[in-house]
Amino acid sequence: MNPRNLLALLGRYNVDPAVEETLAHFAVRNRPEVRVDDEDPDGPIVETYSWVKNSRAGIEFGFQDGAAWFGLDETEFGKHPMVMTEIYFYGEHVGVRSYQGQLPFGLELSDDRATVRKKLIQFEPTRHSYVRDTWDTPEFRITVAYTDGGNCIRFALCMLREPPLPPLGYALAPVPSVVAIVRLLGATFDDPGIHWAFDPLGLRRLTDAITETGQADFRNPYGLALDFTVPEGTHSPGAKKTRLLSATFFEEREQGARTWPGELPYGIRFGDSPEALVQKLGRPPDMQHDNEDNFTGVALWHEPEFTTNVVYDTMENRVLRVSVIAPDSGRDGLSNCFGPQ
């Protein structure tokens, strides 16, 4: 099948005859569907993504529930057709035969990293690189993964960029600057500066949640979460003992958040790649770890005033969330610095 015609299916619904014809053409047996669990407290829709593939044909199609894709309320999940959002073309991949059809942009599975970059040179200003390379075309985003050494293509993934969430319909309160937030790290809950900065966002109504969980969750609508802690050696939490440990800033849709509307430390942007982070921080991270099970990574930079913790996506090579952490927080390891879950 011509790759241009195949990629034209991105954005179409699973009930579209052209989509069904394509799945039949590649002998894909399963059909996309949301996962339902009526007994799950977060259900009944517990998974809005669905992937269907033919391993023998080396191709896989990804779909998402239409309501989830367009950012509608969770009560709408499962009531709309699913949107085709991505297509994988596999090369040297465990358990999957190589795709035998034409690849987009004249790519070949035998191409090495340098050749792939040359063939996609027209999109060079959009390239984000790390373990994989990612480019933006006018219609979609393409990610190319390589075998060890970059000698040939492991897979090429073409995916739609997520649409923006629907507008809120009301104005947000002004958010404090990142400089102001950093200055408050380690401050006690009764510090007037804490309330000057965060009361306009609704901090007072989260007092009980802070006492119970140590967290103030402003992810929706502010893209912000605050972690508080009680210093070691104390037992009963209180305003004079509870201190601001960290602040985490979220990209849109990350952990159900809306985008943090303020600035980020060191001029970081949510669209930055891991390579761009090193340039902006001025040096490699002090600690770094990638998790290929969920295609994310985390990097830490320690400074006397605060620690910067960045979680990024290794499939699209973009920052997902950024945390600033008090220097005396006791959090010196990566495993404890992923922010609120």
Sequence positions of predicted segments:
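Short, recurring structural edge motifs at helix starts
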Residues: 100-105, 182, 261-266
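Preference for well-ordered, secondary-structure-rich cores of eukaryotic proteins
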Residues: 96, 256-257
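Eukaryote-biased recognition of intrinsically disordered, low-complexity regulatory segments
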Residues: 88-92, 248-253
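Amphipathic/hydrophobic helical signal segments and adjacent flexible N-terminal regions
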Residues: 3-9, 178
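Aromatic-anchored, charged helix-turn/loop surface patch used as a conserved interaction hotspot
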Residues: 241-246
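N-terminal low-complexity, Pro/Thr/Ser-rich intrinsically disordered segments
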Residues: 170-181
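Interfaces and regulatory segments of ATP-dependent nucleotide/adenylate/phosphodiester-chemistry enzymes
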Residues: 9, 181-186
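A cross-family detector of function-defining hotspots
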Residues: 2-5, 18-82, 91, 103, ...
